[in-house]
From Swiss-Prot:
The keyword Membrane does not apply. It catalyses: N(6)-carboxybiotinyl-L-lysyl-[protein] + acetyl-CoA = N(6)-biotinyl-L-lysyl-[protein] + malonyl-CoA. It is found in: Cytoplasm. Pathway: Lipid metabolism; malonyl-CoA biosynthesis; malonyl-CoA from acetyl-CoA: step 1/1. This is Acetyl-coenzyme A carboxylase carboxyl transferase subunit beta. Binds 1 zinc ion per subunit. Keywords: ATP-binding, Cytoplasm, Fatty acid biosynthesis, Fatty acid metabolism, Lipid biosynthesis, Lipid metabolism, Metal-binding, Nucleotide-binding, Transferase, Zinc, Zinc-finger. GO terms for cellular component: acetate CoA-transferase complex.
């Protein structure tokens, strides 16, 4: 019996374990909505939208800009800017340590990426929040990158688009982060005065100081399906008012029904829909489909 264990069974188990470990990590993904197990390469083809239930999964900022902008002519804006712990802030952890961890995990310097480029041949400037970087919170660098993006849009007289995904202002930067609400709102007022279109795309989730400033100041406000959008979270509101909130409260569909946003657009339709919309706004020729 012992010879059989040594000669047959143990090698068989070891081969099985070896085969398991040879399967690359991240090859399969479970949908958080319907729990279907999805093959990652196939999921990427659907832009991280579940083919079973149409749930729009969260995607990182670079992926979002990659699928939105044309491949040619992209230029990143404000890539040299890095956050500084001016207040030497510390809660359960030092702010500088939180920044270092977020930078290591995401490969980004901060929570907003801005690029100039083209949308189906039309010059645009686009920004996207990186929610994985400290919850997409808005601090000095996020505000400054957004302002630089808006200034490039002013200079080129081309539309500005921002994909928001944020928990709000970055508490570790205190008043500096709150100032970004006024700073971003002020530059958007300049765009409006100059007749430059600003489209705000609300993805899951958008809360706090970002929803109370730039995210809700679009000439057109677009929501992704079932995105959570609000100022305070539903749990906080329920605890405050001591009442049960309506079904679907703070979902993009609820906001559309109550006039807080203008439209809901499926991720796969976003490029052509926004290209046609911006073409009409800017009196440009119809965009080239791509």
């Amino acid at each position: 019996m012992s010879n059989w264990l040594v000669d047959k069974l143990i090698p068989s188990i070891m081969r099985s374990e070896s085969q398991k470990s040879s399967v690359p990590e991240g090859l399969w993904h479970k949908c958080p909505s319907c729990e279907a197990v999805l093959y990652r390469p196939e999921l990427e083809k659907t832009l991280d939208v579940c083919p079973k239930c149409d749930h729009h999964m969260r995607i990182n900022a670079r992926t979002r800009l990659d699928i939105f902008l044309d491949e040619d002519g992209r230029e990143e804006l404000g890539a040299d800017l890095e956050p500084v712990d001016r207040l030497k802030f510390r809660d359960s952890k030092k702010y500088k340590d939180r920044l270092a961890a977020a930078q290591k995990d995401t490969g980004e310097k901060d929570a907003l990426i801005a690029m100039s480029g083209k949308l189906q041949g039309m010059p645009v400037v686009a920004c996207a929040f990186e929610f994985s970087f400290m919850g997409g919170s808005m601090g000095a660098i996020v505000g400054e990158r957004f302002v630089r993006a808006a200034n490039v849009a002013l200079e080129k007289r081309c539309p500005l688009i921002c994909f928001s995904a944020s928990g709000g202002a970055r508490m570790q930067e205190a008043l500096i982060s709150l100032m970004q609400m006024a700073k971003t709102s002020a530059v958007l007022a300049r765009l409006r005065e100059e007749g430059i279109p600003f489209v705000s795309v609300l993805t899951d989730p958008v809360y706090g100081g970002v929803s109370a400033s730039l995210a809700m100041l679009g000439d057109v406000i677009v929501g992704e399906p079932k995105a959570l959008i609000g100022f305070a979270g539903p749990r906080v509101i329920e605890q405050t008012v001591r009442e049960k909130l309506p079904e679907g409260f703070q979902r993009s569909e609820f906001l559309l029904e109550h006039g807080a946003i203008d439209m809901i657009v499926h991720r796969a339709e976003l490029r052509p829909r926004l290209a046609n919309l911006l073409s009409a706004f800017t009196h440009s020729p119809s965009p080239v489909s791509a």
